[in-house]
UniProtKB/Swiss-Prot annotation:
GO BP of this protein: nucleotide-excision repair; SOS response
Origin superkingdom: Bacteria
Ranges where the GIY-YIG domain occurs: 16-95
Positions of region (Disordered): 488-526
Protein name: UvrABC system protein C
Gene that encodes it: uvrC
InterPro entries: GIY-YIG_endonuc (IPR000305), GIY-YIG_endonuc_sf (IPR035901), GIY-YIG_UvrC_Cho (IPR047296), Hlx-hairpin-Hlx_DNA-bd_motif (IPR003583), RuvA_2-like (IPR010994), UVR_dom (IPR001943), UVR_dom_sf (IPR036876), UvrABC_protein_C (IPR050066)
Length: 673
């Protein structure tokens, strides 16, 4: 890897104007493209403190061998140039929100003499118009079946079309009036194309106009006493209305908007977008990709979300307009809506809004919904994004091949003697030194073993509003492994005693008590009978050193210890000055992150429970024989603990279930407080 100092531009040579920059590797390939309001400020951030950069950004900077830039006059020009370069060079370190091929769309082959309607998955093609994407293929087929009654366009493949053209008979759809049968000349190419164009207009959102036109023709046919045509048109109107009912009305009529939401963790981001046209959700799509680029170095919270918004909108709408330019009869205004609803406005959103307006050809409004139906829909999209990220992580975690690869990668990266089939992880949780607790979670074969989870209330390393995270890690480690050390010592003494007495050697299965960690009554292993292959602490070098020191004191040498720092996802090993950096997309890092996050979740849950109990505790809790029901009855009867404290024994005994002895004990506890 290259040293960034070898290609860092000389001081004062980087301009302060807005522009776009490119990092190239030693082969001259562009590996990253970014834009900046101030090129000097942005590029200097890559070289000032390389160690503090996000791991993926750090990898990019150390992979690069040179950097170059282009100055532009406005930030809008920078947006456009950045998009063009990303599209041209396809840099490996830029996030690409490529269309998810798993989402089906309805394709219309307008580039053919007789356009065809069909369900499609795959890359976009020139001359084909697409509607969707939809969540399920059956939803497209169901809607298409309804609309073919009104718009009897061709749906067959090229081979089927040619065969029926040769035999001179239409297919079944032609006989039931769900195809205009252009294969046998029932309609001309121009008439068939007109049917397809009406179909496209309907799906594009011009629904009310189409329904009104059919109703007008229906009434005209009835007035002319052409009841057969009127009945057919009536059925067509009903079919259109049924198709419309399948698209939920979520916003006001005439509303065209895209609603976008994100869900993130330290490594990945899930994006969901709902396409609303004429107040109805016409399509939905989503992606889960690795975090990359400027967004990961923007901090957390609103700054990160704003950077993700800018990154996504620039690439997504740029590509959608490019697709529209390749498709006849589709204008940029159909893919860039009048309104884009996002969770957070990025810095300099006015320039982004101007760029989107240029793409559309008319004004585009970029805003964060605050209330009403738009806010509710934005929350729905956000829930979808969170669910997509959770499902993505669950799918990876549940895959046996991925788990096996993760364990093998961890073994190789940390130079372990064997794969860490049992991993234990510790996390500390507190609020300003109060209610300090720890959690210990267990993963076996890459899956959580929740029956072995443990909580710890920190005793020695916390108290009086202080908390020592390093000391807390040491305390938990000592409490966890002290029993293991004790059982091993007892087993060694028993073995020595047996050998000294000349006891015969017997099989382990016959004498379960001779083995450490075995319950003498059941012969089964205790839950913590075996040490972990890998012991993970949440933190960096100090926490790892504390845990390793405790294990050395206890004489436990067969447990590997590492630390996983939260933000940078660095793996710290005892005695090593530099962390181990696992590839960001590796199964090993994903598993370690999941173990750490589970320990964090479990610790927070216990911390909140302990804090809640403390905040609701009272002197009544210390009264022997006074349960929760009678404590509640006392407080309810007197209205508060203060009034109960002022009551007499006789007044307290008026409460059902409270005797004289209990009443005296209550008053004694309250006055002692």
């Amino acid at each position: 890897m290259a040293d960034p100092a070898t290609y860092r531009p000389a001081p004062g040579t980087i301009p302060v104007e807005p522009g776009v920059y490119k990092f190239r590797d030693s082969y001259g390939r562009v590996i990253y493209v970014g834009k900046a309001k101030s090129l000097r400020s942005r590029l200097n951030s890559y070289f000032a403190d390389v160690a503090s950069l996000h791991p993926r950004t750090k990898q990019m900077v150390t992979t690069a061998a040179s950097v170059e830039w282009t100055v532009v006059s406005t930030e809008v020009e920078a947006l456009q140039l950045e998009y063009n370069w990303i599209k041209e060079f396809d840099p490996r370190f830029n996030v690409r929100y490529r269309d998810d091929k798993s989402y089906p769309v309805l394709a219309v082959t307008l580039n053919e003499e007789y356009p065809r309607l069909f369900v499609y998955r795959g890359a976009r093609k020139k001359g084909v118009r697409y509607f969707g994407p939809y969540a399920h293929a059956w939803a497209i087929r169901e809607t298409l079946d309804l609309l073919l009654r009104v718009f009897p366009a061709r749906t067959c493949s090229t081979g089927v079309f040619k065969r029926h053209n040769q035999i001179g008979r239409p297919c079944l759809l032609g006989y039931i009036d769900k195809c205009s049968a252009p294969c046998v000349g029932r309609v001309s190419a121009e008439e068939h194309r007109a049917i397809v164009e009406d179909f496209c207009d309907f799906l594009a959102g011009r629904t009310d106009k189409m329904v009104r036109e059919l109703e007008r023709r229906m009434h005209a046919a009835a007035e002319d006493l052409d009841f057969e045509t009127a009945a057919r048109l009536r059925d067509d109107v009903q079919a259109l209305r049924r198709a419309l009912e399948k698209q939920a009305v979520v916003l006001g009529t005439g509303t065209d908007a895209d609603v976008i939401a994100f869900a993130t963790d330290e490594l990945e981001v899930a994006v969901q977008i709902f396409h609303v046209r004429d107040g109805r959700v016409r399509g939905q799509r989503g992606w889960v990709v690795d975090k990359s680029g400027d967004a990961v170095d923007s901090g957390t919270g609103d700054d990160e979300t704003g950077a993700l918004v800018e990154q996504f909108l620039t690439q997504f709408y740029g590509e959608q307009v490019a697709y529209a330019d390749q498709t006849p009869d589709e204008q940029p205004a159909t893919v860039v809506p009048r309104e884009v609803l996002v969770p957070q406005l990025p810095a300099g959103h006015e320039q982004l809004q101007e760029w989107l307006s240029r793409l559309r050809g008319s004004a585009v409004r970029l805003r964060v919904p605050q209330r009403g139906d738009k806010k509710a829909l934005a929350e729905t999209v956000e829930r979808n994004a969170k669910e997509a990220l959770a499902q993505h992580k669950l799918k990876r975690a549940g895959d046996l091949t991925s788990r096996s690869a993760a364990l093998q990668d961890i073994q190789d990266a940390l130079d372990l003697d064997s794969a860490p089939l049992r991993i234990e992880c510790v996390d500390i949780s507190h609020v300003q030194g109060t209610d300090v607790v720890a959690s210990l979670v267990v993963f076996e074969d890459g899956l959580p073993r929740k029956s072995d989870y443990r909580h710890y209330a920190i005793k020695e390393a916390a108290g009086e509003g202080r908390s020592d995270d390093v000391g807390s890690i040491a305390e938990v480690t000592r409490r966890r492994f002290y029993r293991l050390r004790k059982e091993r010592d007892e087993a060694e003494r028993d073995e020595l005693d047996g050998t000294a007495a000349g006891a015969p050697l017997v099989d382990d299965d016959e004498t379960p008590t001779s083995r450490p960690g075995i319950d003498p009554t059941t012969g089964r292993p205790r839950k913590f009978a075996y040490p972990p292959n890998l012991y993970v602490v949440d933190g960096g070098a100090p926490q790892v050193a504390a845990a390793a020191e405790v294990l050395d004191e206890l004489g436990i040498t067969d447990v590997a210890v590492i630390g996983l720092a939260k933000r940078l996802e660095e793996v710290w090993v005892p005695g090593e000055p530099d962390p181990v950096i696992l590839p960001r997309n590796s199964e090993a890092l994903f598993l370690l992150q999941r173990v750490r996050d589970e320990a964090h979740r479990f610790a927070i849950t216990f911390h909140r429970s302990k804090r809640s109990r403390r905040m609701t505790a009272s002197a009544l809790d210390s009264v022997r024989g006074l349960g929760a029901a009678r404590r509640t009855a006392l407080v309810t009867h007197f209205g508060s603990v203060a009034k109960l404290k002022e009551a007499t024994v006789e007044e307290i005994t008026e409460v059902p279930g409270i005797g004289v002895a209990t009443a005296k004990a209550v008053l004694a506890a309250l006055h002692q407080e």
